[in-house]
Amino acid sequence: MLREMARFTIDIQMRFRDIDGMGHVNNAVYLSYCELARTQFYLKHNFKRSLHEIDFILAHVDIDYVSVAEWGDRVQVAVWPSKVGNTSFILSYEITEKKNGRHIA
């Protein structure tokens, strides 16, 4: 089932609290954006009827920051299964600026 799933993209509603003292989205906030995309991905593909029924362990996370997101940017997060094994799978993410497609992370 997971192997056939295509890229899933959501728009992120940036919040004022996401912005740090330097005027851009704080590095830790990107994980929250990915979490939101991941849960919507699971619900869209009916992994279970509710999030409480999804059994998985998040074992590893890494992010390559490419450019900054600033207040007013329209951010999108794409998620897709990039590797599927017998007992585990890897989800990949791409965070972009919606208006111009600029790669953020």
Where does each model-flagged region fall?
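Hot-dog-fold acyl-thioester-processing enzymes
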Residues: 2-60
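HotDog/MaoC-like acyl-thioester-processing domains
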Residues: 2-10, 60, 65, 69-74, ...
